[in-house]
Amino acid sequence: MSTNKSSIEKITLGSFLIALGVVYGDIGTSPLYVMKSIINGNGGLESITPDFILGVLSLIFWTMTLLTTIKYVLITLKADNKGEGGIFSLYTLIRRRAKWLIIPAMVGGSALLADGMLTPAVTVTSSIEGLKILPSFNDIFGNNQDIIIIIVLVILSFLFFIQHFGTEIIGKIFGPVMFIWFAFLAILGIVNLSGNLYLLKALSPHYAIKILFSPNNHLGFFILGGVFLSTTGAEALYSDLGHVGRKNIYLTWPLVKICLLLNYFGQAAWILSQKNNAKLYGIESLNPFFQMMPSWLLLFGVLISTLAAIIASQALISGSYTLVSEAIKLNLFPRLQCLYPSNSKGQIYMPAINRILWIACIAIVLYFRSSDNMEAAYGLSITVTMLMTSILLFNYLLKRKTPLPIALIILVFFSSLEFSFLISSAVKFEKGGFVSVLIALCILSIMYIWIKGHYIKMSLLDYIPIENYKNQLKELKNDVDRPKYATNLVYLTSSEKSKRIERKIMYSILDKRPKRADVYWFVNVIVTDEPYTSEYTVNTFGTDYMVKVQLKLGFRVNQKLNVFLRQIVCELINNGDIKVQNKKYTTLHNRNVGDFRFILINECLSSESKLESWNSIIIRSKLFIKKFTVSPAKWFGLESSEIEVENVPLILGSTRM
């Protein structure tokens, strides 16, 4: 683990390009739609004044400075969990401070996943709509939005299709492409800004405050909803910390910010130069980003912006896989199949999530049809995530012994700022924002059902001391009249106590059909707060035939149980804790480990269960969701092992622990 961390912290040309390709896709494509959204929302080009433009630029500059630079880059990036970032990594650092902290973690994670469904749709659509300005495109298709939609659907479908094969090869071009993209943004901005340097006055916060109360601002306070789009990628920047390291973000962010600001200022200069151009007044959804390009550069501009949009979408898709994977390991989300299409660290693929994201993105494009309509829905959910991150960050600062007044100032300042953006974005609800809210609520409901169902079951399950059955297990082990069921018989237990297991496990061994084995294993898997922990403790109860294993794995470690267990068995044999398990017939010389059989207990709710109506609904809902999840055999990597599934009635409410 230390090697991985040190390698990503190195500052090289390669790490510089990787950071550009991985971290800044979302925030880097914001110039495609931020100014467009604000200008069209204020009544179009004809309603623009110099004071309005200065105010907008000032709002964008200070939003990026306060939220992205100060909150995320300078403060939040320091809240890393062994080099890993993101809202769930932050939660694992502080979850022992208070149980209620799971609420902002779940709410923030749900909203971030909802944002991941909107981002690919809005960025790709915004870039492809640039084709409408091309004379050759207009001559053939005119102002036909259906053609734009078809192209967007093809690109998105292709992007989701290739996830199955991994993106390691094409991922190598992400960095160079984003380098060209940011250079393009800067050059385009400088060319249009030259001669309009008075716009640099917008760096003063005076203009940001003034525009909120100016009669030239037809949106009033709600202009912040459009301005916020310039910083939506800040949360993704924190989530990708583990891929590139803090030092690489410190190095690249100032350069990225300068490129973005130069482009925003260039767009502003073009807007002021064209505000009296009546020919542009009738253009629907005027986009300054494409309009300020010379005609000979338009095709390249559309191509490079589309590539940047695809890279931004890829980053959000990969981020969604990672986010769901972490939620699963923290028992906040149902277990779904995880595949590893490449050898790169952190490269995972989740087929179910990929299908859901693809269907959601396609549905969003078909429902909203244009980037204008999508922008109306975009940004609302991410403000919620930022607010939740601020709450978790406050608790992290207190844990790190930050003086309470300083921690409170940070919490109040950034929460007030983010709450202002949330209120200003709330106007988007009826214009399409309800879509992201509904998506977030669906995800949150699944999380709530899953974790609440777990707590209900854990509080009512019947646990028993293993030592009470030591003699019976010894007699069963030595009962030669019974055929040997397995050399090593393995059960998974949820009990974290070293001397207790669920009664249903002992019932399976002794009552259902007595199972004779040389060694009985009771394995409890605990997910730790650190990302890459891999350690275990054992309790043999003074025997060589009963072992309770507590396997501690980091929240980013694959839970391949057979691999870990075989290693543990070998170590216990070498230490003399259990006997050598010689096999009479084997193709391997000197093999001293016998066969394994895993018993997986499948629970179904019994009609005898006595639960309150709400708890009963939760448990039944969880069991229903469980039908669509990956089997324990696949989750724990036991597909090639000998397993047996036993159905056991889940009787809850009659016995308390």
From Swiss-Prot:
Fetch the InterPro entries from UniProt. K+_transporter, K_trans_C, K_trans_N, Kup
The places in or outside the cell where this protein is found are: Cell membrane
Mind listing the UniProt keywords for this protein, alphabetically? Cell membrane, Ion transport, Membrane, Potassium, Potassium transport, Symport, Transmembrane, Transmembrane helix, Transport
Which purpose does this protein serve, as stated in its record? Transport of potassium into the cell. Likely operates as a K(+):H(+) symporter.
- Name of the protein this chain belongs to: Probable potassium transport system protein Kup
Molecular function GO terms recorded: potassium ion transmembrane transporter activity; symporter activity
Per the annotation, which location comes first and is thus the protein's main one?
membrane
Name the gene for this chain: kup
At the top level, the lineage of the source is Bacteria
